[in-house]
């Protein structure tokens, strides 16, 4: 009888511990990259996930868009996104979801051509939408969710 009670108590304790582990809130960690802007965080880590803020194609050194139109902005967006993900302990190849915001859906095919070159394997899940306007009149903005390395 003692053995049965001990087994029951042990199983109950394990069950309570497991439920606590799955329902306990994860700690949130803010990732700091570049000069602070005070308006939003470049990325937030919760558990094993990294959530980035949207990245536009501003060169962080000059504060300007690179010359060269849509392709140049796209390439700078991915440089910025890569920098934020790497500062978070992740990387582009660990992205699981991306949301692409385009100022003009006529850039969709060009974006797809450039986008597929960014990944070694299967690309992450993705949503692409056209928006009325982006900050600083950017042509593209990308936000991502990634897992830690």
Predicted regions and their residues:
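N-terminal presequence-like segments and the immediate start of the first folded domain
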Residues: 4-8, 16-79, 83-93, 102-149
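Surface-exposed aromatic
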Residues: 96-98
């Amino acid at each position: 009888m003692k053995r049965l009670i001990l087994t029951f108590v042990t199983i109950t304790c394990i069950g309570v511990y497991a439920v606590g582990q799955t329902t306990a809130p994860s700690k949130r960690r803010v990732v700091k990259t570049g000069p602070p802007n005070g308006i939003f965080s470049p990325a937030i880590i919760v558990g094993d996930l990294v959530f980035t803020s949207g990245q536009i194609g501003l060169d962080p050194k000059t504060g300007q868009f690179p010359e060269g139109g849509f392709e140049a902005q796209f390439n700078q967006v991915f440089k910025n996104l890569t920098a934020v993900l790497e500062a978070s302990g992740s990387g582009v190849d660990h992205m699981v979801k991306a949301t692409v915001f385009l100022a003009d859906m006529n850039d969709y095919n060009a974006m797809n051509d450039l986008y597929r070159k960014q990944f070694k394997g299967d690309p992450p899940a993705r949503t692409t939408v056209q928006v009325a306007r982006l900050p600083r009149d950017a042509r593209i903005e990308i936000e991502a969710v990634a897992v830690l390395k």
